[in-house]
Amino acid sequence: MFLSTYENKIDKKGRVSVPASFRSHLSNLGYNGVICYPSFNNQSIEACSQDRIEKLSASIDSLSPFEEKRDYFATSILSESMNLQFDSEGRISLSTKLLKHAKIKNSMLFVGQGQTFQIWEPAAFEKFKINARKKANLNRASLKWEKHFNNNEGK
């Protein structure tokens, strides 16, 4: 699972180190890299495992081939996705297109989202986070809590 937030800088060759815990999780899934694509929800880069992008692809494929929504999702996600392999030091090279989308210049935040993570320009993420916390507070009653405990833990 991808948890926490880490800040890393782009080196002179345009590479950035992916946090060790994120690389470890991807490696445990049998993948030595990450799939990245520009978010269509916000000004970030979406990042996920090979398995996750295959699930997204299957979800898109489940739509009728003649449905416009299928083309919208395939174009916005699959055609924009990049398969980035880690080098020997756990770094990736994000394309200029991805960096421009997120307005990243020298430093970026790797933001854990559970099964995925996002890559943000730090100041943009801080603004987003403030708004997200407000909206989470307003919508907290809609978060479902399944009881997974035999004793009364987690109530």
Curated annotation (Swiss-Prot):
Claim: Magnesium is one of the keywords in the record: no
PROSITE patterns, sorted: SPOVT_ABRB
One GO CC term, this protein: cytoplasm
Main location: cytoplasm
Family designation: Belongs to the MraZ family.
PANTHER family on file: TRANSCRIPTIONAL REGULATOR MRAZ
Name of the featured protein: Transcriptional regulator MraZ
Organism: Pelagibacter ubique (strain HTCC1062)
Name of the gene encoding the protein in the UniProt record: mraZ
